[in-house]
Amino acid sequence: MEERKVKRIIMFPLPFTGHFNPMIELAGIFHNRGFSVTILHTSFNFPDPSRHPQFTFRTITHKNEGEEDPLSQSETSSGKDLVVLISLLKQYYTEPSLAEEVGEGGTVCCLVSDALWGRNTEIVAKEIGVCTMVMRTSGAATFCAYTAFPLLIDKGYLPIQGSRLDELVTELPPLKVKDLPVIKTKEPEGLNRILNDMVEGAKLSSGVVWNTFEDLERHSLMDCRSKLQVPLFPIGPFHKHRTDLPPKPKNKDKDDDEILTDWLNKQAPQSVVYVSFGSLAAIEENEFFEIAWGLRNSELPFLWVVRPGMVRGTEWLESLPCGFLENIGHQGKIVKWVNQLETLAHPAVGAFWTHCGWNSTIESICEGVPMICTPCFSDQHVNARYIVDVWRVGMMLERCKMERTEIEKVVTSVMMENGAGLTEMCLELKEKANVCLSEDGSSSKYLDKLVSHVLSFDSSAFAS
């Protein structure tokens, strides 16, 4: 009897942490279902393949091979113009010679690409003769907003005008004008091109995989189905599926991990405010100063992640008030990095002050932790509005109100006065996330459909 060939999936993430991590989680889900997975990655921000020995990693060099790489590690630091950066990525990295890069080794079912690569991935797919699926790293509600951008421009909502910030967008309830998922950029037309290309790429694909679940975004998913007219697979939360992925990395300094764990273990249940603004968001020095004093004045225990370079114009903590670290004593910990999944799951954590990136939002929902919402750009504004007004599992703390007394007020309110009500809603949503992953849950059923869908494609090996 002829031995059955292993089906292979090619995955093409955008090289940012918030996009790469969910793609790797999806790769683990596919691998757990018996697929071989090859990860294509740009030559910068290249991940450590040794952390994922079950996958094959291939470097895609930019199309002007022999020239200096047009992008460098420094170009992806906080505060860079993301529209310019994504435009460069799309320009230089979406027409690789995949036959040479990936080689042979199994039958290729499909190419799964980050939706932001847009229609150019169709060129990639044609080169290898397979179908293309896209993965969205933000929620369905945000994608609905992106599909409406041409209408929003016609209606005068975009570009955003300061005088209309609190006006409701009647076409996209419950969003206000200030919630529209835009990015501050010197090339607004470039942003429109990227988003239009993303939407059109999704329409041309053989399906869209979403890191969300039906009970969380039922109405938004219905809207997306109507607009895209392709199969949708909301199989999230990705990170809760059983896979053979290794645990998330620890701090390089094992002693730091042990000190932090020991400190958390000494705190009362649900007493700690965990603060983290993700891998790309940047804040101003005066905001950093106010956050520090707001946390201190709350008199609540806090764990605050401050990435090197997160505060514009500084390396790390030099902007802290003189004597601040000594002043907080054992009240708080300021660190460069933590394992977020482990932190949110710790019983001492009672609230998450977040930038509302989609990964952070989903992870907090899964652990039943109330959120303090300070969105910075793009989909974070949409996520924050849904967290506060639709799912009712958080409170808003806008950047325009980033003043120590307001910070103290909101943090205290979430942890003490309104905490009970928020926690109850959080636990209900957490239970829905657990149910969707059960054997008869919606995400489990969609995963079965996704696997069948991928296997139904006309398989073809790489052209020789």
Swiss-Prot record:
UDP-alpha-D-glucose binds at residues 279, 338-340, 355-363, 377-380. Pfam families: UDPGT. One of its GO terms (molecular function) is UDP-glycosyltransferase activity. InterPro entries: UDP_glucos_trans (IPR002213). CDD domains: GT1_Gtf-like (cd03784). Belongs to the UDP-glycosyltransferase family. This is UDP-glycosyltransferase 76F2. It comes from Arabidopsis thaliana (Mouse-ear cress). The gene is UGT76F2.
